[in-house]
Every structure is written in structure tokens, then in C-alpha cells.
Amino acid sequence: MALRIWASSTANALRLSSATRPHFSPLSRCFSSVLDGLKYANSHEWVKHEGSVATIGITDHAQDHLGEVVFVDLPEAGGSVTKATGFGAVESVKATSDVNSPISGEIVEVNSKLSETPGLINSSPYEDGWMIKVKPSNPSELDSLMGAKEYTKFCEEEDSAH
């Protein structure tokens, strides 16, 4: 447990140190996987809001920097999440990173496939690799998140700074 806490603090909020990041060209492959119609947090989670439910996962950019995902720690359905607060963790061959919720709400479903096949986050971050589904308690929180173009620019600037 102490090792997990240490690793989580080392790779806090999916921001890996430049020593563990591979060097990318200014437009790495991840930018082709920033999807329109989703909202993005600066901690590299995405939200797809449909009706009364929002699906949350980590972005392709995040999984690309993490490397091969080997374990996912998720909460149980029925609990709640708070905006900008951790709800789970992703362990990869490189590091362990906390996953923050971009919005607040009640967890209505958890992707149980990730316990058996955590690599779905790598192979399909926006489809099969989703993490939780939430009934938003404050849908206006979505307005503070980035669209695809803003998120792409954010990633470019973040990568060029490292």
C-alpha cells in the first residue's frame, strides 16, 4: 500500500515527470484521438454526457503517456464523486496515477471489464475503456471543461513544456 501511495504521489493527476515521458514530436499520435463531442479536463479525463448520464474515462493522451495499463482501481456503483477529486487509480508499467472526476455526481455504473482486461484503456480509451458512469449532480460543471480543440492545444502546450 505504501508503494502505491508513493507511486500515486509521484505521478499525481496523470502528470508524469519528464524523466519518464518518452519524447514526442509536437503532434504525437494522441491528437488524432481527441474526439469532438466530448469534454476534457486538464487532468486528462474525458466526459461524454448523454441524457441524464455522463461516461468518464482517461484520454488517449493520458494512456499514451502512461504506457501499458496493468491494473485499474475503481469505486463501486452507488457511491459518489466530486469534481477534481480522485475516484480511482490506473497502474501501468511506468507508474501509478490517480484518476480525478471532471464532474460531481452519483456513480451509477462501473466498467467491470477493466478488472479482467485493464488494457482496454490502452486499446480503446473512448469506447471499451470507459471507467465510470455518473448521474451529474451539477450539470453546469460540464461548462468549465475543454472542447476537443482546446484540449488538443492544452496537450501541445503541456508536451512542449516538458
UniProtKB/Swiss-Prot annotation:
Function, in words: The glycine cleavage system catalyzes the degradation of glycine. The H protein shuttles the methylamine group of glycine from the P protein to the T protein.
Feature: transit peptide: 1-31
Co-factor binding comment: Binds 1 lipoyl cofactor covalently.
Lipoyl-binding domain: residues covered: 53-135
Protein name listed in UniProt: Glycine cleavage system H protein, mitochondrial
Subunit structure: The glycine cleavage system is composed of four proteins: P, T, L and H.
UniProt source species: Flaveria pringlei
Compartment(s) of residence: Mitochondrion
Co-factor(s): (R)-lipoate
Modified residues (N6-lipoyllysine): 94
Keyword terms: Lipoyl, Mitochondrion, Transit peptide
Family membership: Belongs to the GcvH family.
SUPFAM superfamilies for the chain: Single hybrid motif
Record gene name: GDCSH
